[in-house]
A protein has these predicted regions:
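Conserved catalytic-core segment of nucleotide-activated headgroup transferases in glycan assembly
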Residues: 2, 7-10, 15-22, 122-198, ...
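Active-site and donor-binding regions of nucleotide-sugar-utilizing enzymes
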Residues: 4-133
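Structural alpha-helical scaffold elements that stabilize or flank donor/cofactor-binding regions
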Residues: 39-40, 83, 170, 220-221, ...
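Hydrophobic/aromatic beta-strand patches that form the interior of the parallel beta-sheet core
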Residues: 47, 62-63, 89-91, 117, ...
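A donor-sugar binding/catalytic signature common to diverse glycosyltransferases
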Residues: 57-65, 215-258
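Catalytic binding pocket for nucleotide-activated donors in carbohydrate/polymer assembly enzymes
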Residues: 87, 106, 110-113, 118, ...
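Nucleotide-activated donor-binding/catalytic signature segment of Leloir-type glycosyltransferases, i.e.
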Residues: 193-214
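C-terminal amphipathic helix plus adjacent low-complexity
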Residues: 276, 280-388
């Protein structure tokens, strides 16, 4: 019998915020809850959302996404690299993700032991809090928004090359509230923290610019904004989910590779522009706001499920599965099982083994870490001789 104890394993502040919402509902149902950043935590029910997890340390495991556009460059088959067959149940946030999963459900690695469910996006459950106009007004007054003006929010995936400054300079000619919400990076991302600090220092004395604490819930910022500007961040998807137009600046660079690349922004739901035309793009959206907002809302209505009450559905499913009771929600039906093509299977096995060794055994064993480092150096020497 599985005890009613859930351990939520998070990597960053954003994931922790979402887990706090789920834990609140779980506590109401009699669950003991723990939030931890220890990815090796041994637990009764482990709740995971990162790319690489270790559910072997839990008696029962739940998997969901941490990013609504997670692994976008590898769609539809994110499960090739991030298999779900090692978990008990999986939760999907939208019809887009159901479509991704359907295309891959014929492969064993996309199927949790007890099924995949369309539940919705748990972060969106905060929307109900903003149905109270008094709470919304209080937040608007707290951060200093002028309600007589439209509000444009900057929420990038990465801060680099002075993007925040380019955004601010593009907005200053307009009669708008200017809000900045950077991502809450952890200490291991020193370059990002340095870039954000430099931008904060640059704009801190500009009365037109409201710089929010990076730990602010992004949905709070979106709710009091009219337009969101980014490059490839999932914040654009969340903005559209809430019926707010989102703009992707397609020639802002993304520094996660060397040399930096252009953003992966070929989403149907965003307005694309170049940084040189950002001012005019915002003017056009504001001049035709009803049209753009209606398009965003239509996309949201078509693609997102259970907005505002996803978490109770997740907990209903978990209750039913661990207690062996009738489940009023039906798991998605996978396609007839097929063998994984040999090239995909080889890649999948190699990637799974590499991640297990690098992120698990290497961290828990000094001997394995030394062997890994030694092998890596040998490989580097071989490659340098080949190139030389």
């Amino acid at each position: 019998m599985i005890k009613k104890e859930i351990t939520f394993i998070y990597f960053d502040e954003v994931q922790k915020q979402v887990y706090e919402l789920i834990a609140e509902e779980a506590n109401k149902r009699g669950y003991k809850t723990i939030l931890t950043d220890n990815k090796f935590s041994r637990c009764e029910i482990g709740w995971y959302c990162e790319h690489i997890n270790f559910p072997q340390f839990s008696k029962f495991s739940v998997i969901m996404l941490h990013d609504i556009t997670q692994q976008y460059g590898n769609w539809p088959d994110i499960w090739l690299r991030e298999p779900w067959n090692k978990y008990d149940i999986g939760f999907l946030p939208s019809n887009i993700w159901v479509n991704n999963w359907n295309q891959c459900s014929k492969y064993y690695y996309a199927n949790p032991r007890k099924g995949v469910y369309l539940t919705g996006w748990p972060k969106a459950d905060r929307l109900s809090a903003f149905m109270d106009e008094k709470k919304k007004d209080t937040y608007i007054k707290t951060i200093g928004i002028d309600r007589s003006k439209p509000t444009v929010l900057y929420a990038p995936a990465w801060e680099n090359d002075g993007k925040q400054d380019e955004f601010v300079n593009a907005m200053l000619p307009l009669d708008v509230n200017i809000i900045v919400k950077q991502a809450p990076w952890t200490d291991i991302y020193e370059d990002q923290l340095k870039n954000i600090a430099e931008m904060h220092e640059l704009h801190k004395n500009n009365s037109r610019v409201i710089q929010l604490d990076p730990k602010t819930n992004i949905l709070d910022a979106i709710m009091v904004s009219d337009i969101l500007v980014s490059e490839e961040s999932s914040t654009m998807c969340e903005s559209v989910m809430m019926g707010k137009p989102a703009v992707s600046v397609c020639n802002w660079l993304i520094p996660d590779v060397t040399p930096s690349r252009y953003p992966a922004d070929n989403y149907e739901y965003v307005v694309k522009t170049k940084k040189e035309n950002l001012t005019n793009c915002i003017i056009d959206i504001l001049d035709n706001y009803e049209k753009y907002a209606a398009e965003a809302q239509a996309y949201s209505d078509e693609h997102f499920a259970n907005i505002g009450h996803c978490i109770p559905i997740m907990m209903d499913i978990l209750d039913a599965v661990i207690e062996g009771k009738e489940n009023k929600y039906t798991a998605l039906k996978p396609k007839e099982r097929e063998r994984v093509p040999m090239n995909k299977l080889f890649f999948h096995k190699k990637e799974t083994l590499k991640r297990e060794v690098y992120f698990h055994y290497r961290e828990q064993s000094k001997t394995i870490d030394m062997l890994w480092t030694f092998a890596k150096r040998i490989k580097q020497r071989i490659n340098s001789r080949k190139n030389g």
